[in-house]
UniProtKB/Swiss-Prot annotation:
Protein's name according to its UniProt entry: Hydroxymethylglutaryl-CoA synthase, mitochondrial
Gene: Hmgcs2
Domain of life: Eukaryota
Transit peptide: 1-37
PTM comment text: Acetylation of Lys-427 is observed in liver mitochondria from fasted mice but not from fed mice.
Top-level taxonomy: Eukaryota, Metazoa, Chordata, Craniata, Vertebrata
Catalysed reactions listed for this entry: acetoacetyl-CoA + acetyl-CoA + H2O = (3S)-3-hydroxy-3-methylglutaryl-CoA + CoA + H(+)
Amino acid sequence: MQRLLAPARRVLQVKRAMQETSLTPAHLLSAAQQRFSTIPPAPLAKTDTWPKDVGILALEVYFPAQYVDQTDLEKFNNVEAGKYTVGLGQTRMGFCSVQEDINSLCLTVVQRLMERTKLPWDAVGRLEVGTETIIDKSKAVKTVLMELFQDSGNTDIEGIDTTNACYGGTASLFNAANWMESSYWDGRYALVVCGDIAVYPSGNARPTGGAGAVAMLIGPKAPLVLEQGLRGTHMENAYDFYKPNLASEYPLVDGKLSIQCYLRALDRCYAAYRKKIQNQWKQAGNNQPFTLDDVQYMIFHTPFCKMVQKSLARLMFNDFLSSSSDKQNNLYKGLEAFRGLKLEETYTNKDVDKALLKASLDMFNQKTKASLYLSTNNGNMYTSSLYGCLASLLSHHSAQELAGSRIGAFSYGSGLAASFFSFRVSKDASPGSPLEKLVSSVSDLPKRLDSRRRMSPEEFTEIMNQREQFYHKVNFSPPGDTSNLFPGTWYLERVDEMHRRKYARCPV
């Protein structure tokens, strides 16, 4: 029977026992844990070694209950057929009414995760939120989520909001892992929550919106392990996408610059990651170069799906340029003409793009395409986009197919901050294993997406107008019928004259 660590007060008792007795870690663990059905045991107290296999134990995805079809938007906006569905690679776009805001999205996804896993609320020692959807310049989303912990009496929870465009979720994940592998870890689990509402003014950018949230339970002995020492990061100052107008939800976007920044960050993060993993291999006696062949699956931050296909092709181009002439001729047919180019010379080269997309198509279909299911059908979720891709990947493969694989991940946030990192999937795919349970938990993703209501472009536009009208308005209750929300969804019930927000939950 699976077990779970005890409340915080029990942690203190065990630490005292450590000082008074010579109990081994195994004795401490069995004395301090309680039975639990879906999450594997975690070591309780810090020892002289790292907690083993820190990573993602459980994952929950939330998206709004309505969407607009991109083919309908193409007709409504009088653009050529395929501009959104082919040019951007988008099929549907989820969106929120005035009844939902970033607080309600995060309340919903955390509550769902905790209820599904049956995790006691006092078993969480860190909760961090990654978001760029700011409705208060001072009060963090994390503070609103503390309402969920009130009945448990658990207020000893570290972490706060982290913001830098779409990168905040990844920064929160890294912070959770760092906490767990530090002297400050008290033996409890961490929750990482990332969510956003991506909206744009009417025009070319509006079809690249979306909305959603992802919650991840972080702990040791995870089925998706963050590979230690393997992060390649790039940061710089850029004005590719930013939100200086605090009176509006809408960003300012330099589209061409943003694509160049994304690709440049990808190049540099991949180079840094490759250097670190090759150093690890060299220390182990392996002098082989790292390439995409060493990654079984690859997921990306997804502003729109076509960008991801270009990004995988870009990684192949990095491998091509760093390989020997013999390998270039044998493994990368069709790219020989670009052998003498430098990476920075190719960001806007359409001939290079076309050749790379063709050369990498099979690899894209094998490693990445399945990860785009949620993005294709719901749009850009900003901080939760990358982790929605992870959920999509898990939902389209069996535990047996995933077991033992490496999942590469690229996270990007405008402004800019980016990282390339990786997960190592557990080799245990047996029935009832943590990996099998994790995969099963997201297997209903396609069914849930299909259960949403299809709204017309006219209805979508009206709701966008309402969001503009009520943004930062006070003393009002949002219009709309809460029966249209998914069961168990938290929603904004009222904003009073002092901007204080009250939330309620739909019946489960």
